[in-house]
Amino acid sequence: AFLCISFIANAQQKLTSPDGNLVLTFQVNKEGAPTYDLTYKGKVVIKPSTLGLELKKEDNTRTDFDWVDRRDLTKLDSKSNLYNGFKLKDAQTTTFDETWQPVWGEEKEIRNQYNELAVILFQPMNDRSIVVRFRLFNDGLGFRYEFPQQKSLNYFVIKEEHSQFAMAGNHIAYWIPGDYDTQEYDYTISRLSEIRGLMQQAITPNSSQTPFSPTGVQTALMMKTDDGLYINLHEAALIDYSC
């Protein structure tokens, strides 16, 4: 039996918002890392930024579900890598447009319109695939990681997310320290480059506060560019999340 896997060239994949103002460019760089950038009306909003995940390394003192010894540390290091070594296997685009009515809120009807790009990435060194799905709306970009059912990626724990958002400028940011337990902080307004130096004084002596990083901030993070564009970074579709 022969296994035949074909790949499309690692050329740039472009996606445009329905109104044409936002343009996403995706490609796999020379290290095999998924990379994207975003422009708005021809101006760079997000510079080339890499995507990926790091998995928790398996315990090398145990056997796997097939009772195979897992003492090859090099292989275990490789299996924790979901951030480079990829090839672009396929790219699919779709469009979607619907109007729905919320139960309450300021709008009677909300239009859900976007163009979508799904990139299927194959990692030869671990014989596994992931999907990165982008949705580009007239007012923003969303993306998520998907894990097709496969033997080589059956059970795993995500240790770190390595999604990058490389801002195109030293924007004004409206931020609070990143915290596991609370949102009860006063907002600080500063340039992005000043966050590290201001973090200590942004944390108040409060037993409910548990900052997770000396530099990390909480989402939603709102920013304002020098030419008046507002940018907001946040999470979406937290389905079944323990909050």
Please report, for each region that a protein language model flagged, where it lies by residue:
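N-terminal accessory beta-strand-rich subdomains and adjacent acidic, glycine-rich linkers
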Residues: 14-243
